[in-house]
């Protein structure tokens, strides 16, 4: 099969550093044939010397040689450029945020259906090994009924780029929180959560938030807290999971968990008689422990560059969806739930 001919709109940290870097190692599946950026010196890449340079998204989308458009512009332009590309008959991969509102998402989905094209949200961190391992352990039931999940991305440092301004839709709520919310909603499961959220601008030079504290709750659901901080020099572990049989903790480089088999423990009933010797309830727990380390570990935290593996997995899924017609592993409809939370 022929490689998919790709045009990238917005060739900055994401367009160049993430997407072009992934595609250059997948040349049998994807080929960058066009690059658009409002900064002239950004319209080229040494790995794709034949890519046509364009000054605007409109010009790139009008290129009949482009089959798929990667939208990696300022946040505020994601939905408008994606809709424009779909109307132009192109497949679309849209960076996060996948729009600001559910109306944005609905309009993109409608354009994709009308054009008969694939619309792919870039939620590649769904493929991260630590997340997938945490999800599999929770689903196995060994930790019992899950009561609490905490997901933390901590760091300490200032930013002064466009992501700290509201002008182009900056701020951590729509920059990195889409990844945490994606993980949180996957672990929340079916149904719509009650949402509480607090944000703050602490170290960023601009007014946009650099700290987000979000809580999801629901009937018969665990409390899920997703927190992103720019003022924590003592970064917390990414994962903390608590259940009725045990718990889990760790991050991208190692996870540990332990649990109790209550069927092997003495059966207890409520005893209203004061305990002899004025002691507190105490019993010896027989723990089963386990741990996991990935083959290749990624850095954690809000400022860490994404690991290449999950990005390539998403691109493999996208290639199969476009060339072979296989179902997408991450759909626009699924990501719509995340946008509703945000």
Question: Which residue stretches match the model-derived regions?
Answer:
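N-terminal Rossmann-like dinucleotide-binding module
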Residues: 1-48
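C-terminal glycine/acidic-rich active-site capping loop/insertion
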Residues: 245-329
């Amino acid at each position: 099969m022929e490689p998919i001919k790709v045009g990238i709109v917005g060739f900055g940290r994401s367009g160049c550093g993430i997407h072009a870097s992934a595609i250059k190692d997948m040349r049998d599946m994807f080929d960058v044939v066009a690059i658009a950026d409002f900064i002239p010196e950004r319209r080229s890449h040494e790995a794709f010397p034949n890519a046509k340079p364009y000054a605007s998204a409109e010009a790139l989308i009008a290129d009949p040689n482009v089959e798929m458009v990667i939208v990696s512009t300022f946040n505020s332009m994601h939905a408008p450029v994606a809709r424009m590309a779909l109307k132009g008959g192109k497949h679309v991969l849209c960076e996060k945020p996948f729009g600001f509102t559910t109306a944005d998402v609905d309009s993109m989905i409608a354009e994709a259906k009308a054009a008969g094209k694939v619309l792919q949200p870039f939620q590649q961190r769904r493929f991260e090994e630590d997340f997938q391992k945490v999800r599999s352990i929770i689903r196995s039931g060994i930790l019992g009924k899950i009561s609490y999940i905490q997901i933390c991305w901590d760091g300490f440092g200032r930013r002064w780029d466009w992501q700290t301004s509201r002008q182009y839709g900056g701020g951590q709520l729509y920059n990195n929180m889409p990844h945490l919310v994606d993980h949180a909603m996957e672990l929340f499961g079916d149904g719509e959560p009650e949402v509480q959220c607090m944000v703050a601008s602490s170290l960023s030079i601009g007014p946009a938030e650099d700290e987000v504290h979000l809580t999801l709750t629901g009937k018969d659901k665990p409390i899920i807290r997703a927190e992103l901080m720019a003022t924590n020099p003592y970064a917390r572990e990414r994962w903390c999971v608590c259940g009725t049989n045990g718990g889990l903790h760790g991050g991208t480089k190692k996870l540990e968990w332990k649990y109790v088999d209550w069927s092997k423990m003495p059966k207890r009933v409520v005893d209203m008689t004061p305990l002899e010797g004025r002691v507190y309830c105490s019993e010896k727990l027989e723990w089963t422990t386990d741990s996991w380390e990935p083959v290749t570990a990624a850095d954690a935290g809000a400022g860490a560059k994404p690991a290449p593996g999950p990005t390539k997995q998403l691109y493999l899924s996208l290639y199969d969806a476009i060339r072979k017609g296989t179902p997408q592993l991450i759909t626009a409809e699924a990501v719509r739930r995340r946008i509703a939370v945000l």
